[in-house]
């Protein structure tokens, strides 16, 4: 669509720093792929929705297990950084597959088709920072 993900989450804009307290996080959005009957397996919590003129989109994301037939690769301009906070995730990136555990991280060009999902039918949580060029 050519629009950064955070555009749909913006509220009031702040010119200075934005602080997001752990206990005050609000679920911003939850979704999965466009696959018919897909479950909503990813809950996004925006960590910067009121920051004006931002180019990075930091999110805390809870990932529930989802059936493999719901995995649909996506791509967009920019870069992504992910660190696993809890559990394990699997990332399909191009023709490669990576399994990351708590404390592991990955940084990649998001123009390459990719999909992030919980691994081994367990829940997981990640911190993801998405950069989309202006």
Regions found by a protein language model. Give the residues of each.
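DNA major-groove recognition helix of helix-turn-helix/homeodomain DNA-binding modules
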Residues: 1-7, 12-13
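Short, conserved secondary-structure segments in the cores of folded domains
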Residues: 71-72, 80, 96
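Long, charged amphipathic helices and adjacent flexible linkers at domain junctions
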Residues: 14-27
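A generic "binding-loop/recognition-motif" signal
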Residues: 12, 77, 96, 112, ...
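Short, conserved beta-strand element in jelly-roll/cupin
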Residues: 62-64, 75-91
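Conserved short histidine dyad/triad with adjacent acidic residue
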Residues: 24-34, 40-50, 57-76, 110-113
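Short acidic-glycine-tyrosine-enriched beta hairpin
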Residues: 47, 94-110
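Ligand-binding loop in jelly-roll beta-barrel domains
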Residues: 40-43, 101-102, 110-134
């Amino acid at each position: 669509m050519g629009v950064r993900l955070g555009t749909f989450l913006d509220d009031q804009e702040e010119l200075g720093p934005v602080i997001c307290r752990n206990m005050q996080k609000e679920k911003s959005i939850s979704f999965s792929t466009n696959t018919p009957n897909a479950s909503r397996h990813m809950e996004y919590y925006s960590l910067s929705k009121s920051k004006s003129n931002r180019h990075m989109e930091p999110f805390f994301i809870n990932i529930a297990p989802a059936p493999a037939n719901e995995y649909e690769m996506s791509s967009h301009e920019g870069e992504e950084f992910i660190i696993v906070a809890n559990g394990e995730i699997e990332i399909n990136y191009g023709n490669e597959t990576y399994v990351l555990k708590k404390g592991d991280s990955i940084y990649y060009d998001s123009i390459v088709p990719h999909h992030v999902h919980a691994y081994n039918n367990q829940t997981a949580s990640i911190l993801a920072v998405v950069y989309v060029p202006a």
